Amino acid sequence: MKRWTTADIADLSGRTAVVTGANAGLGLETARVLAGHGAEVVLACRDLDKAKRAADQIRAADRRARVTTVRLNLASLASVREAADEIRSACPRLALLINNAGVMELPYERTEDGFELTFATNHLGHFALTGLVLDRLLATPGSRIVTLSSLGHLDGAMNFDDLQSEGGYRPDEAYGQSKLANLLFTYELDRRLKAAGAPTIALASHPGVVCTNLFRTRSKLEQTLISPRMRVINFWAVQNVQMGALPTLRAAADPAARGGEYYGPRRRFYTRFTGYPDLAESSERSHDAADQARLWAVSERLTGVTYRIAAGPPYPEGLCPQPARVTATTTATSGPRSSRRP
């Protein structure tokens, strides 16, 4: 079977991509490759200084690279709306939205909007951002939305009765739930896009096991075991960032990819941890149509962002569908807007 690599990516000149969390790791590699193939790339990052340094790094490696930055804190709906406004102002058309940013297994914390931090960052922020820039995607024939999930979704379950973990918090469960939410969102979004006959498709990906900044919350032993210096013994279980970004890049740029597909490393050494990108299987829970619809409704209520999906590629300039409607946000808790659990 042919191995899919970055050499299979066509010229992306004239296409604009937004990559969240693009200042390091998988996001930076994804942005670098897209820019190297001619795309104009917007690095949407929480820390604008780090985003600018990442942009400088990409330009230093390729003087032709067209890279800009925008501040995006996915844990803040106000920041998401500001970033979406900036993106919409700068990008009349948007070919790719890569929902890459994420956090993993953090101590319990509530955001300023009252949401559990992992769920807010990994799912709700991306749900809101996607809806708020959707008109720019719908205005672009062949546009794609790629959301990163994780093998962690396999152990994930949606606790709709306590999405904010008020009744008890376990970092691994919060992470698994958020990664399952990424897939439920992707499948429901693509279903709605298809039903509307829209020119945009939604896909998902996972990187396998890659040593990135996400692992900074893990134990020293775990960090050591997956580090590059242990490559001689962990080669079967851990891959580098360049390989880890390939499933996302394939979902974003392979002409043969279809909406609703999920890409990850091809099975190697009987695991799904490493390998070249191919279609991947997601859990039975991720295909639960009732949970997909329920999560969508809950996400609209919590974020205040209601999607408007209309049919008809391409939309004439100036006649794009209106952006997602923003309503008053319903917070997940009463009392203090932001709190930590002791």
Regions found by a protein language model. Name each.
Residues 1-222, 301-316:
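Rossmann-fold NAD(P)H-dependent dehydrogenase/reductase core
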Residues 43, 72, 236, 284-287:
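Pocket-edge positions in alpha/beta enzyme catalytic cores
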Residues 161-169, 222-229, 274-282:
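Short glycine/proline- and charge-enriched loop/turn segments
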Residues 178, 230-280, 287-293, 297:
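C-terminal helical subdomain
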Residues 265-267, 314-318:
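Short, solvent-exposed turn/loop segments enriched in Gly/Ser/Thr/Pro and often Arg
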Residues 336-341:
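Short, intrinsically disordered C-terminal tails of secreted or membrane-associated proteins
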